[in-house]
From Swiss-Prot:
One of its GO terms (cellular component) is cytosol. It comes from the Bacteria. Coiled coil: none annotated. InterPro entries: AlgH-like. Belongs to the UPF0301 (AlgH) family. It comes from Beijerinckia indica subsp. indica (strain ATCC 9039 / DSM 1715 / NCIMB 8712). This is UPF0301 protein Bind_0718.
Length: 205
């Protein structure tokens, strides 16, 4: 059963990378993250958590998910607003794949549930946001991810140091773009890198 979850509202400070994009480098040895673009939702001394932005979830779409979670009845799926019918459902990462996370624009907020991140992007992981989207009263922009990418204390820093990831400021237009197949190349180009010339020796943007 897929479920939503509560969020820890503690945000990191200082030289952490919350609100930035992680772009996998060509030497990424973990096939789960090869050519992935990840939005980093939280980063602190205790570890990091992010959502993969360019991999679609298999075997389920948003209307089906709403029915499964009993947000709507099966007969109501045909009456959803267009924004709900077409909303992306992503494979957000390999951790807790039965949990749902909604990345969205900051025009929507639920007390004690929504975590503002950076640059007009927030994260909500309770079923209330799904109800709002189903009614057409949700955020202007949103994507739903099942699962997330997680790192233990110091793990992400070590991977970046060993050129596993490129990090750069996030762009909401890229986060919420539904052209998943070209998102990796476009993320690289946004930091001035031609994907055809990128090598495993490249540094940070």
């Amino acid at each position: 059963m897929i479920s939503m979850m509560s969020l820890d509202s503690t945000q990191s400070t200082g030289a952490f990378l919350d609100g930035q994009l992680l772009i996998a480098m060509p030497n990424m040895v973990d096939n789960r993250f090869a050519r992935s673009v990840i939005y980093l939702c939280a980063h602190s001394e205790e570890g990091a958590m992010g959502i993969v932005l360019n991999r679609a979830a298999r075997k389920i779409n948003f209307p089906q998910l709403l029915v499964q979670l009993e947000v709507i009845g099966a007969d109501e799926a045909i009456r959803l607003p267009n924004s709900a019918e077409t909303m992306q459902v992503l494979n957000g990462g390999p951790v807790e794949t039965g949990r749902g996370f909604v990345l969205h624009s900051d025009d929507f907020f639920i007390d004690n549930s929504t975590l503002p991140i950076d640059g007009g992007v927030s994260l909500t992981a309770t079923i209330d946001i799904l109800r709002a989207i189903a009614k057409g009263s949700g955020p202007h922009q949103a994507i739903l991810a099942l699962g997330y990418a997680g790192w233990s204390a110091g793990q992400l820093e070590e991977e970046i140091q060993h050129n596993g990831w490129l990090n750069c400021p996030a762009d909401p237009s890229l986060i919420f773009d539904d052209a998943l197949g070209s998102k990796y190349e476009r993320a690289l180009r946004k930091v001035g890198i031609d994907p055809g010339y990128l090598s495993s020796e490249a540094g940070h943007a």
